[in-house]
């Protein structure tokens, strides 16, 4: 009886207790799910502090609770793989550990997205592929490939990566860099070193599979069939054509003294043996008739350059810089095309003059073109070629102007003909001045007003206007003792030659009898009674300084202009210093990664007035005609090739090459 009562009483109670227990555990599970984002859970369910990763996971979890069950149930019939994903997803909901939440959130990505995320986070564990998804095709394209920015809806929830949220908050990717990314590589490669100057982040290093000559290709610009500035066609008569190259080849000693300028270069391309072979290959390729070189190291010249150039058919003249400098300038020409008339080395150093205490030099050659015998009895005017390397110091524009005045005076003397005119002139070299600077305008326009000009502004290389103290040019720029006029001519060239032995008459000499110097007792004169003890008495009315005019006649005096220098050589530049097809300035060198033009080829041209703008001088071809030139490059193109020097160009300057024609006249 009791047992029956217990059976009927305890069985319902047990069932009720079981029901309440199940309800209790169900409520506990729901409570844990609701509190899974709280950091206050104790024990094994404790979580790390909230951050961008956890917030992203919470958003994904909430989205899954709202939409995921229906999508999961709808795919339950697709197969065992879907069931496995459902089971794993359900199990992930019960996991409150931060690492397990990351794994659960990654299950939301497709296999392609997960592979990208794994690659970004350097994770090696592969993820199972989604059923029906095609495998990724291997990229067999070039190393550097343009990849468009992904903006599709499938990436809308991928703004923050699970493992890289903090990095994404600290650094924002440049859109220009996002558009360019590296294609998948089979093997890791070292990152190419790049220059740390402004703007370079917009460029990528060139592919190593692409030869440098494809990046640094220079076009030959032919002007032989184009009209000149006045619309006149080139003459149809015979011409003596030749090419001239000007090249600063970078002395090895100077490169080693300023090694900080070439940290971007691989050591192998800075080796002299590599550079020498590259330079000789460049000379052989362009094969100029006249070669003007700067920064030629003396030992390299005599041991390697001169013998090699002589084997190529050149006759060379070299002038080393004064002092202890080891480099200099060289002018080489082919004796089959020219005959040497005279060679004049030019030294800018003048003892005792602070303005001219630098060791730069120049070379001036007068060459006679050799006309082929087939043209008969014809003649060609001589050609004057000047080559120089002017002082670099951007602050000493006064020194640069004085050096240029000495060179122009030497050119004026060498190129002057018997009738007072000048033969065709080519002046080239490294002038360490930018286009449209006062020094450049002085060479091109033939006149410069310099009085009061800051010395740094002469070359325009750098801007020192912010400095408190600035050296300013004062008139006269150089002393009269230099023997050069303000028209950049030697004084002896401006006055008729005088007899070396001067003749004076008796009356002229007697005028010095009672001058101040004659009435002074010489120092150390022995006193002898009746001989040297007499003091001369100047007659009354005798002028003390009556011979000043005579002294002025003996010493030639040239007038000095106030703050203006001039020259009459009528020079113009071969290059225009602008690339219209690129919309960028031309560049001949890149010191510290900043491109600029400092190398030039100037040649003789006839000046003519411009009817529209009388203040601007136009030039047209004269006896010497420009037939073509080798184009220069822009700063951006040289950036793409990692600057200068590089494996293709072995100097920190680009070579300049031009073709000329000279009129051939009958005698």
Swiss-Prot record:
GO MF assignments: catalytic activity; eukaryotic initiation factor 4E binding; mRNA 3'-UTR binding; protein domain specific binding
Assigned keywords, A-Z: Phosphoprotein
Residues that bear Phosphoserine: 77, 105
InterPro entries: CCR4/nocturin_mRNA_transcr, Endo/exonu/phosph_ase_sf, Endo/exonuclease/phosphatase
GO cellular component: cis-Golgi network; cytosol; endoplasmic reticulum; mitochondrial outer membrane; nucleus; perinuclear region of cytoplasm
Family: Belongs to the CCR4/nocturin family.
Protein name: Protein angel homolog 1
Organism: Rattus norvegicus (Rat)
């Amino acid at each position: 009886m009791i047992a029956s009562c217990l059976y009927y009483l305890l069985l319902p109670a047990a069932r009720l207790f079981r029901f309440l227990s199940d309800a209790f555990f169900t409520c506990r599970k729901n409570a844990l799910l609701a509190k899974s984002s709280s950091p206050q859970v104790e024990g094994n369910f404790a979580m790390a502090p909230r951050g961008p990763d956890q917030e992203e996971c919470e958003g994904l979890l909430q989205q899954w609770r709202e939409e995921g069950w229906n999508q999961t149930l709808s795919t339950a019939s697709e197969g065992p793989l879907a069931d496995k994903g459902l089971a794993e997803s359900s199990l992930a909901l019960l996991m409150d550990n931060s690492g397990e939440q990351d794994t659960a959130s990654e299950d939301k990505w497709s296999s392609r997205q997960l592979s990208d995320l794994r690659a970004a986070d350097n994770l090696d564990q592969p993820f199972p592929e989604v059923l029906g998804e095609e495998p990724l095709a291997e990229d067999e394209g070039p190393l550097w490939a343009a990849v468009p920015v992904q903006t599709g809806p499938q990436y809308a929830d991928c703004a923050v990566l699970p493992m890289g949220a903090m990095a994404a908050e600290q650094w924002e990717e440049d859109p220009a860099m996002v558009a360019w990314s590296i294609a998948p590589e089979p093997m890791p490669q070292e990152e190419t070193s790049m220059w740390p100057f402004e703007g370079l982040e917009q460029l990528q290093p060139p592919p190593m599979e692409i030869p440098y000559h494809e990046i640094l290709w220079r076009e030959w610009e032919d002007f032989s069939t184009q009209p000149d500035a006045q619309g006149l066609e080139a003459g149809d008569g015979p011409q003596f054509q030749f090419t001239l190259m000007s090249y600063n080849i970078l002395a090895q000693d100077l490169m080693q003294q300023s090694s900080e300028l070439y940290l971007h270069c691989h050591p192998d391309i800075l080796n002299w043996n590599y550079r020498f072979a590259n330079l000789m290959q460049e000379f052989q390729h362009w094969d100029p008739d006249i070669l003007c070189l700067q920064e030629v190291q003396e030992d390299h010249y005599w041991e390697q350059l001169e013998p090699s150039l002589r084997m190529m058919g050149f006759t060379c003249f070299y002038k080393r810089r004064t002092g202890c400098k080891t480099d200099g300038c060289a002018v080489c020409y082919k004796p089959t095309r020219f005959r040497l008339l005279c060679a004049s080395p030019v030294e800018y150093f003048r003892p005792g003059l602070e303005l001219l205490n630098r060791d730069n030099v120049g070379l001036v050659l007068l060459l006679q073109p050799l006309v082929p015998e087939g043209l008969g009895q014809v003649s060609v005017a001589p050609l004057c070629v000047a080559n120089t390397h002017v002082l670099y110091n951007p602050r000493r524009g006064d020194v640069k102007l004085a050096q240029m005045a000495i060179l122009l005076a030497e050119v004026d003397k060498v190129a002057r003909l018997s009738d007072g005119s000048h033969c065709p002139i080519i002046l080239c070299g490294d002038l360490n001045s930018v286009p449209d600077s006062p020094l450049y305008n002085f060479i091109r326009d033939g006149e410069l007003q310099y009085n009061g000009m800051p010395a740094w502004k002469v070359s325009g290389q750098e801007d020192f206007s912010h400095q408190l103290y600035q050296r300013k040019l004062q008139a006269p720029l150089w002393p009269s003792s230099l023997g050069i006029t303000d028209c950049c001519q030697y004084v002896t060239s401006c006055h008729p030659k005088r007899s070396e032995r001067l003749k004076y008459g008796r009356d002229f000499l007697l005028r010095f009898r009672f001058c101040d110097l004659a009435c002074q007792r010489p120092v150390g004169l022995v006193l002898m009674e009746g001989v040297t003890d007499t003091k001369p008495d100047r007659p009354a009315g005798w002028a003390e300084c009556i011979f000043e005019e005579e002294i002025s006649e003996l010493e030639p005096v040239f007038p000095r202009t106030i703050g203006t220098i001039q020259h009459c050589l009528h020079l113009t530049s071969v290059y225009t210093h602008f690339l219209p097809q690129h919309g960028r300035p031309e560049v001949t060198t890149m010191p510290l990664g900043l491109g600029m033009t400092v190398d030039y080829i100037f040649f003789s041209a006839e000046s003519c007035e411009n009817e529209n703008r009388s203040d601007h001088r136009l030039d047209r071809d004269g006896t010497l005609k420009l037939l073509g030139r080798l184009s220069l490059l822009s700063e951006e193109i040289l950036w793409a090739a990692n600057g200068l020097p590089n494996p293709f160009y072995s100097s920190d300057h680009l070579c300049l090459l031009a073709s000329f024609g000279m009129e051939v006249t009958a005698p």
